[in-house]
Structures are given as structure tokens and as C-alpha cells.
Amino acid sequence: AKKAADDMAGLLINKESNIEPIPIIYGVRRVGGVRVLVSTRDASGGDPNEYLYICLVLCEGDVHSITDIHLDDIAITNSKYSGLYSFNVHTGSDSQTYDSLLTEANSGWTNTHRLRGVAYIAMRLKWDADVFSGVPEITALVNGRKVYDPRKDSTSAGYDSSLGVSSQRFATPSTWTFSVNPSLCIRDYLSNTRFGKGLAGTKLDDSAFGSAATDCDVTTSFYSGGSASKLFDMNAVLQTDDTLFENVQIMLMGCRGFLPYNQGVYSLRIDKSRSVVYAFTVDNIIGGISITGESKENKFNRINVKFANSAIDYQPDSATWPDAGSTEESTFLAEDGGTLLVSDIELPTCSNYYVARDIARVILRRSRNALRCSIQVTSEALQLSVGDVVTVNHPTPAWGDKPFQVEEITLNYDGTCSLALLEYDSSIYTYDTSAVETTYPD
């Protein structure tokens, strides 16, 4: 838990390096950056080294905007900095030109230093001993990458005319727009050729990604009297020195996503309450059933989630479920013989307390309904997808239409299929309306 908080706090500091990996920002985050240039210039006819020049790289581009710049945790618009700064922001387009401020510095920075594809701040500061004690820490609020939405592309299988936009095109990034929708961000990461997997559009099921995006747009009231808000947003800083698998897992966890791979094509599904799509009985189950019960190692009665909270300017925060002293806590502890079973989870894509709390709740509830089984069935199971809900009716375990969720589908050499199934309870996805409003200091 401490490491998670340290990692999040580390995103707000400035580093100096010419080999530091450049992160990717999806959604909205406050970040520091990497100083790739620190130089000075004498004032004309004045003091030596009076002007300090900084080039602070923030993330991969092209991002939507860079705003609300702070120096040493104080807004740059504060009167204490009046007359002491000039800056330019560059959102990281592939066609951006050089910054004229930086060419003033005694550093060899020229008009060929364009940092195309990189979002950065060019800053000039005038020395004032009453204001600065050294090189200030700079942070900025970044509205991250512009992403493609297949629902807004009239040529896409995922097109949704009800959204009123038809002009986006996957092959034309200038038509893309900023979004915090997890499905669209995951699709962007999978298709990006510079820092992602570089998948062609034909390898992505845009009908599925569009449906998942619509699922992520569903709103709920986080507490009594609260306004409707989305339960799934993506506000993440991904590290490009982490593996593709690690980053995709981070993104999926924040939206309860599955990423099935069928016949060479990736799709996305959001884990939610679903209807049963297929029933398995002795007529299509071949052989016996292998059953694995829940294990104490993976069963919890308390989940702590670490996240960067937008309500406190993206500082590290935590959410816990169930609440201390609650009926749920007492019930779970009684069922577990009074033993506290705790899991600490880092949620890098989340910036909202209520969302973090609800994800903790779903993870905990699933851990307590974690019966698994494996069955061999007839080839009709090939029509299923990971995330589908099925029922199993079989006399051996005395199951009558017991619901399960498909975790894995394997085609066997003899034409049959093997399914890995997880016990399914649709009630766990209903938002916990007992949440109370949390207040934060200004």
C-alpha cells in the first residue's frame, strides 16, 4: 500500500533525465514531468544567470490540453509570480514546431528541436530571491490523449447514429476527440503504433468496443442527493517501460473489462449484470465436472484501494469496503471465524472515491462467490465468448440451472470444447446506494 502511494506521489515530482521513459496519459491527471533542458541566460546589461529556462516533458502526445500550471504547488497565476514567468505549452502533435522561448537559452537549443509527438511545457523564469529558493517543481493538469470512437464513425461496424456525430475516422487522427471512456482508451492503446500494440483496425471488433463504450457511459448517483456520474472513467498515467500486458491489465481492471481474442480479433466486454445466453445439461456436457472451491488465499473480507483522488488534486488517497463497523463487515468476519482477510489494491486508472469504493466492493463480493468448475461440452459452445453467462444443470453436484460466467474456452482436438467457468451472481453489480457523501477541504 505504501509503494502504491509512493508511486502515485512520484508522478507529481520533476526528474532530470535524457533516458527517462515518456508516459502516456489517458483522461485527466495532474503530473510533473522530466526536465530535458535546464539552462540560464544573463540579463541584457543586468545580472548573470537572471533567466532560467526549463523544458519539461509531460507525456506522449497528442493530448487535448495542458492547463492549471503550478510552481511549487502554487498556481502560476498567483500574484507572487507576477512578472516572473513566461511559458508555452505544446500538446505533442506530430507537426508541432520548435519553441522560441527555449532558443533564447544558452544551451544550443535550435529550431530543429521540435519534440514532435511529445507534450511539454517550455518555461522561462526570472530570478527573484524572495520567491524562488531553487529550481521550482512544475506540475500541470493534463487532459490526455485524443482517441477514436467507432460509434462516431459512419463507416464503422460500431457506428451509433443516436450520438449525432458521424465524422470520425480511424485513419484520420485529426478527427479524434478527447475522452475518458475506458473502452476508447483501451482501443487506442491496442492500436497505437508508437507505444501500444500497433494492431490494425481489422484486428479490433469495433462493434464490441462500441458496445463496451456505451456500457462505460452509464451513470449512477454516488450518494443520496448526488448528481448522476459515470461509474467508469479512465484517468491514467501509463508507463511505457512497463509491458503491454501490464498496462492492458491496469486499464481493464479500472472498468471491470475482459479482452476476448477470437479468430484473430480482439473485443472488449464490461463485467456487469448479464442475462443467461446458454444452458448446459447432461445432453451437452460430456463426462464429469471438475469443481474447485474458493480458497482462503483469494477470499477477502476487507479491500483497500489506493488511487489518485481528483478531489484533492490527484494526491494519493484510499477507499475501503466494507465500512468499519458495518453490517457487512460483521457478517463477513463471522463467516470467516473472526479472521481479517485483507487485500490492498492499486487502481491507477481511478480518480474518484466512490468508484474506488465500488470496485473494492465488487472485487470482495466476487472473492466470496468464487466456486469454479471445468466442463467438457459439445462444439455448440464455440458460439460463446469470455464473459458470457451460462447455466449448468447436472445431477452430480445437484445443480439446477446454476449460473456461471465463462472465463476460458478451449477447442479440443476431437471437436469438443473445454470451458472454465466461475460462479456468477448478478446482484453484486448493483451499485451500493448506502455510500455517504465524502467532503474534502478546499
Predicted regions located by residue number:
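Surface-exposed loop/edge segments in extracytoplasmic proteins
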Residues: 75-80, 275-278, 314-316, 400-401
